[in-house]
Amino acid sequence: MTYLELLALLALQSVVTGATFPDETITEWSVNMYNHLRGTGEDENILFSPLSIALAMGMMELGAQGSTRKEIRHSMGYEGLKGGEEFSFLRDFSNMASAEENQYVMKLANSLFVQNGFHVNEEFLQMLKMYFNAEVNHVDFSQNVAVANSINKWVENYTNSLLKDLVSPEDFDGVTNLALINAVYFKGNWKSQFRPENTRTFSFTKDDESEVQIPMMYQQGEFYYGEFSDGSNEAGGIYQVLEIPYEGDEISMMLALSRQEVPLATLEPLLKAQLIEEWANSVKKQKVEVYLPRFTVEQEIDLKDILKALGVTEIFIKDANLTAMSDKKELFLSKAVHKSCIEVNEEGSEAAAASGMIAISRMAVLYPQVIVDHPFLYLIRNRKSGIILFMGRVMNPETMNTSGHDFEEL
């Protein structure tokens, strides 16, 4: 029996491009994945990269045929596209996102690790190179320690050493023949940076009303801001949306948070592709006081259960049709891992994926205050195309690494 190991890796923070592609296709799929993840852990932080997973699934689709390929296209929302159009989009996006003239750094790297002597169709290898610029490496999976070290070194190299130990020797054995690896790295600086000397310790109130102390950044400036109703017509039914651009204005981080007394779980069920588009079209540039936590999130997700819940099942069974990849029978996906990391600090973001109190008046002010001192959801998106590169939520900053600049305790 033959196994295909897919280890979809990501370390990242934001970016996308203006490729012509129905942005709601990827956005809807991103929202579906987010909703599944929040359903598996009510009080847990969430972090994943729709971009990284889309690239990994694109590589799988390239090797699939028949009902297996049809199932992947249906799950990803590609049915309205002509066959193969999605590959051209992913290629064009990758080329634009990683262009040297961009004011951010983004690396997209793909690699196919193949068992020595294992036959992979030449046409598949050519297409893999053309659409994903993928490397092909021949290894001996029976030497699992050496293979794991080789893959982890490759990942570290492409994520600026932010993501380590993606795989372990136990992930491979004598029947493993293929491993597909996808790595995404992003580093961007805020268009308007937070001054480190303004960072102070602040109380963050979790949904269970307990409090933790966190480093809170602060600045006053012009940002895209809007207030929206959750439809409840109650006093706490208004929530805030803030968009903070990175240098170059192509990429931004969008934050959504309810009023402090309203749990994030009240807002999350409203999340849809159309709502995100409404946020983007409705926020207006204005002066805002922003209090934003400095945080780091690293998360590893077993994609197998999530992809199955989203309708992708055939690639995980021995009847999978991956004959575009290899003539070998009983080739299927036995493992799918997604690892991501994001750091948000005073300068901006980097991904490969601090005590005292400050007094803030919540009384009438000259302009809006966005005080991110309770659970919130966030996404990093390309402002032109609307495509989401990174998505997540912060429920409990106590579990996250908040290291960074030293800050003053008040």
Curated annotation (Swiss-Prot):
Detected in neurons in embryonic brain cortex (at protein level). During embryonic development mostly expressed in CNS. In adult expressed in brain and much less in spinal cord, heart, kidney and testis. Serine protease inhibitor that inhibits plasminogen activators and plasmin but not thrombin. May be involved in the formation or reorganization of synaptic connections as well as for synaptic plasticity in the adult nervous system. May protect neurons from cell damage by tissue-type plasminogen activator. Belongs to the serpin family. The gene is Serpini1. GO terms for molecular function: serine-type endopeptidase inhibitor activity. The record marks R362, M363 as: Reactive bond. Coiled coil: none annotated. InterPro entries: Serpin_CS (IPR023795), Serpin_dom (IPR023796), Serpin_fam (IPR000215), Serpin_sf (IPR036186), Serpin_sf_1 (IPR042178), Serpin_sf_2 (IPR042185). This is Neuroserpin. Its main location: secreted. The keyword Signal applies. Residues 1-16 form the signal peptide. Glycans are attached at N157, N321, N401, S403. Keywords: Cytoplasmic vesicle, Glycoprotein, Protease inhibitor, Proteoglycan, Secreted, Serine protease inhibitor, Signal. One of its GO terms (cellular component) is neuronal cell body. SUPFAM superfamilies: Serpins (SSF56574). It comes from Mus musculus (Mouse). It is found in: Secreted; Cytoplasmic vesicle, Secretory vesicle lumen; Perikaryon.
